[in-house]
């Protein structure tokens, strides 16, 4: 179920949102960020397991995750689903459809979530007053493409244990950017969803979590994970730790 929430005059806007350092305003001068307040006029609340948008829906907006988290996924002709991304607060969902002018994936809430609706006509309108906005969205699209390419490289070139380690380190970095703990967080996605994303079976993911626990790399209790040995995880994927 979706529930649309019109913004009240005292609601948090882009210029006062605590996610501004990772969302649309990231890197923009303060005087320009104030003009972004005109971009978002409503929010949508999406219950866990419900869809924000479907594959091939016309693209009339992109969405900034305000709280909660979502997954994006594709479905092939046989009905098999492939998860293409997990999206945390401050991240923009739907950018991958801007070239085709339609959504190229479906977006589903992993938990009760709320997103800011950024309608494309509003982007065009505000861009006439703020020419740098179009460039900002190109940067955001570039960030999304880079993330997708990194994921393809991870799945294509790494062993199974390296894929899971890279996934956990990626979440660690993203939570740190939000100002949360980089070593303790809750996995909002199931192990089966992690496996689907990484190209691993559920059994392999479960086995690797157990192995990482035995080796002292992590401590996990159901979906609560603590990264105990960050240097060890980085070494596993061939990164030098500082």
UniProtKB/Swiss-Prot annotation:
UniProt-listed CDD domains: CAP_ED (cd00038), HTH_CRP (cd00092)
Organism: Bordetella pertussis (strain Tohama I / ATCC BAA-589 / NCTC 13251)
Matching PANTHER family: CRP FAMILY TRANSCRIPTIONAL REGULATORY PROTEIN (PTHR24567), FUMARATE AND NITRATE REDUCTION REGULATORY PROTEIN (PTHR24567:SF75)
InterPro entries from the UniProt entry: cNMP-bd_dom, cNMP-bd_dom_sf, Env_Response_Regulators, HTH_CRP, RmlC-like_jellyroll, Tscrpt_reg_HTH_Crp-type_CS, WH-like_DNA-bd_sf, WH_DNA-bd_sf
Transmembrane domains' residue ranges: none
Statement: the UniProt record of this protein carries the keyword DNA-binding: yes
SUPFAM superfamilies in UniProt: cAMP-binding domain-like, Winged helix' DNA-binding domain
GO molecular function: DNA binding; DNA-binding transcription factor activity
Gene Ontology CC, one term: cytosol
Chain's role: May regulate gene expression in response to changes in oxygen levels or to changes in the redox potential of the bacterial environment.
Record key words, sorted: DNA-binding, Transcription, Transcription regulation
Protein's UniProt name: Transcriptional regulatory protein btr
Gene from which the chain derives: btr
Location of the HTH crp-type domain: 158-231
Residue ranges of DNA binding: 191-210
